[in-house]
Amino acid sequence: MPILPKYESFWAFLLIACLIPVLAISVSNLVAPSTSKNPEKSTTYESGIEPMGESWIQFQIRYYMFALVFVIFDVETVFLYPWAMSFDDLGIIAFAEVLVFVIILIIGLIYAWRKGALEWS
């Protein structure tokens, strides 16, 4: 039995997944009005005031640490929600797996807390 027919649906979905962005960008380029190459239109303009000085500002690393911790726990929520919706069907094994997952995340949170990543001062 050839292996190729087994993956027909995969290749079809892969082709569709590649064609949708290409078609969306092509249609957007065809339908969108032409833009002028005026350099004034590419300048920074906010709240009716022309910017003064350099626009590059260095952010403190604390912002990135908070963002990283937020992303970690946001991803945790994304993984836990489908599990919670099908909790009755999955059984005790899935509960043990999720418990290990949450324990690993709690250990990571304690590590970040002890390293001072969550302190603002």
UniProtKB/Swiss-Prot annotation:
Instruction: Say which enzyme class the record assigns.
Output: translocase
GO MF annotations, alphabetized: NADH dehydrogenase (ubiquinone) activity; quinone binding
* Annotated InterPro entries: NAD(P)H_OxRDtase_bac/plastid, NADH_UbQ/plastoQ_OxRdtase_su3, NDAH_ubi_oxred_su3_sf
Q: Can you cite an annotated GO cellular component?
A: NADH dehydrogenase complex
Q: Where is the signal peptide?
A: none
Gene3D superfamilies of this UniProt entry? NADH:ubiquinone/plastoquinone oxidoreductase, chain 3
User: Which keywords appear in this protein's UniProt record, sorted alphabetically?
Assistant: Chloroplast, Membrane, NAD, NADP, Plastid, Plastoquinone, Quinone, Thylakoid, Translocase, Transmembrane, Transmembrane helix, Transport
Localization recorded for this chain is: Plastid, Chloroplast thylakoid membrane
Catalytic reactions on record: a plastoquinone + NADH + (n+1) H(+)(in) = a plastoquinol + NAD(+) + n H(+)(out); a plastoquinone + NADPH + (n+1) H(+)(in) = a plastoquinol + NADP(+) + n H(+)(out)
Task: Please verify whether the record's keywords include Chloroplast.
Answer: yes
The superkingdom of the source organism is Eukaryota
UniProt GO BP: photosynthesis, light reaction
**Quaternary form?**
NDH is composed of at least 16 different subunits, 5 of which are encoded in the nucleus.
Q: Which family does it belong to?
A: Belongs to the complex I subunit 3 family.
Function of this protein?
A: NDH shuttles electrons from NAD(P)H:plastoquinone, via FMN and iron-sulfur (Fe-S) centers, to quinones in the photosynthetic chain and possibly in a chloroplast respiratory chain. The immediate electron acceptor for the enzyme in this species is believed to be plastoquinone. Couples the redox reaction to proton translocation, and thus conserves the redox energy in a proton gradient.
Protein name, per record: NAD(P)H-quinone oxidoreductase subunit 3, chloroplastic
The source organism is: Staurastrum punctulatum
